[in-house]
């Protein structure tokens, strides 16, 4: 059975009016020594694409999906067929999932694991047949009512144990399927109020949880990259991994920073009061950029995520990613869903085409900027006072407050220069327009 009645999506260039074609993403086209598919490493998210029903806090699900009329296990099997057809037709090489995305929870942990075993075998067969790969998997330790107080940070030790058992199973799945990364997102790892929260105990327990996970991965020979996905809130009022800087400090405190990097989501940066580029830059500067959840927050809605369609944002994001040397073994996972009003099955294809093209265009622009040393030249000019004289001594740690005081006494007039920030923004616009015109 075919779930998507279209041909494989092809690159037709920016002048094409075919909605089911790529305008900027040409998988085999090389930029330098790498193809676009190697540089972008696109991934489809199982949850938003194949399990989400487009419900929201004010309305029931409206998504029309061929598999939704089936019973739970048959539905899970149908979704396996659907996602591999989807990846083939969209030319996406990777996928990601939570444990409960791929199979239903049973009446007990044992039954849940048995359900997982059945579906994982089907996924493994499909992976072997198609060459598609698992970018990352993770454990859903936030949806079920047992996680009302958290998972690793729960006040109930039995919940901690249950969450740990689920992670153990997910790590075994990661090894079996060759998952290139393993992600932790702590949607319930935080608090509603400090009035009844032992923050130190909860953070200590969270660190213990991560250490046990890494220890078990080593024990079974799983070598995938471990990733933490920061988010400041939603669903919990205050989540402990608020942003990259906060989570980095946590990892450093508990001596986990050599074992983990970050999976950075664009909309989580927005919720934290940062730009997407800020989070990517902080992670890159600290050698902690591991992977990306590609989406954008709706400017009027905090809780929603859409496919990326902002070329300005994707250009700056791809600049950071290219300067990072790429994302491998991470990738660009479309942790996004269609708008509620885009409820047809074909909209799943169309939204991914939009997101892939937007990142591909951003890649083209960012690559050209790096070729031209655009930002590098700006930085060199702005900070040139630190390349010689007293500035160089400051950078190299070869001066003191006393010497700087003596130096300052001899300054007659301090002359600052304008950043011309508006000119820089205008030049970025011109890069985007020039890339488009060139194609």
Curated annotation (Swiss-Prot):
<comment type="similarity">
    <text>Belongs to the xylose isomerase family.</text>
</comment>
<dbReference type="InterPro" id="IPR001998">
    <property type="entry name" value="Xylose_isomerase"/>
</dbReference>
<feature type="active site">
    <location>
        <position position="98"/>
    </location>
</feature>
<keyword id="KW-0859">Xylose metabolism</keyword>
<dbReference type="GO" id="GO:0042732">
    <property type="term" value="P:D-xylose metabolic process"/>
</dbReference>
<keyword id="KW-0119">Carbohydrate metabolism</keyword>
<feature type="binding site">
    <location>
        <position position="306"/>
    </location>
    <ligand>
        <name>Mg(2+) 2</name>
    </ligand>
</feature>
<comment type="function">
    <text>Involved in D-xylose catabolism.</text>
</comment>
<dbReference type="GO" id="GO:0005737">
    <property type="term" value="C:cytoplasm"/>
</dbReference>
<feature type="binding site">
    <location>
        <position position="229"/>
    </location>
    <ligand>
        <name>Mg(2+) 1</name>
    </ligand>
</feature>
<protein>
    <recommendedName>
        <fullName>Xylose isomerase</fullName>
        <ecNumber>5.3.1.5</ecNumber>
    </recommendedName>
</protein>
<feature type="binding site">
    <location>
        <position position="304"/>
    </location>
    <ligand>
        <name>Mg(2+) 2</name>
    </ligand>
</feature>
<feature type="binding site">
    <location>
        <position position="268"/>
    </location>
    <ligand>
        <name>Mg(2+) 2</name>
    </ligand>
</feature>
<comment type="subunit">
    <text>Homotetramer.</text>
</comment>
<keyword id="KW-0479">Metal-binding</keyword>
<dbReference type="GO" id="GO:0009045">
    <property type="term" value="F:xylose isomerase activity"/>
</dbReference>
<keyword id="KW-0413">Isomerase</keyword>
<dbReference type="InterPro" id="IPR013452">
    <property type="entry name" value="Xylose_isom_bac"/>
</dbReference>
<feature type="binding site">
    <location>
        <position position="293"/>
    </location>
    <ligand>
        <name>Mg(2+) 1</name>
    </ligand>
</feature>
<feature type="active site">
    <location>
        <position position="101"/>
    </location>
</feature>
<dbReference type="Pfam" id="PF01261">
    <property type="entry name" value="AP_endonuc_2"/>
</dbReference>
<dbReference type="InterPro" id="IPR036237">
    <property type="entry name" value="Xyl_isomerase-like_sf"/>
</dbReference>
<feature type="binding site">
    <location>
        <position position="335"/>
    </location>
    <ligand>
        <name>Mg(2+) 1</name>
    </ligand>
</feature>
<keyword id="KW-0460">Magnesium</keyword>
<feature type="binding site">
    <location>
        <position position="265"/>
    </location>
    <ligand>
        <name>Mg(2+) 1</name>
    </ligand>
</feature>
<dbReference type="InterPro" id="IPR013022">
    <property type="entry name" value="Xyl_isomerase-like_TIM-brl"/>
</dbReference>
<keyword id="KW-0963">Cytoplasm</keyword>
<feature type="binding site">
    <location>
        <position position="265"/>
    </location>
    <ligand>
        <name>Mg(2+) 2</name>
    </ligand>
</feature>
<dbReference type="GO" id="GO:0000287">
    <property type="term" value="F:magnesium ion binding"/>
</dbReference>
